[in-house]
Amino acid sequence: MCESNAYLRKPGVEDSIFLEMVDRVYNQEDDLVLEDIFGRKKIIKAKIVELALVDHKIILVEK
């Protein structure tokens, strides 16, 4: 499988998992919408700060 996991980064804290097995990421106005392989969606006011493609990681920071 080639899905990535999305992590939320906060200062001084280890990155925490936000959503596993992410299949799609897209903008919806000021939000990011992440959808997993089962069609579950999570919406967050955040920006992508890093895509680690080999490690299958999407790193987010809240706006």
Question: Where are the language model's segments positioned?
Answer:
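Compact, glycine-rich, soluble single-domain proteins
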Residues: 2, 6-63
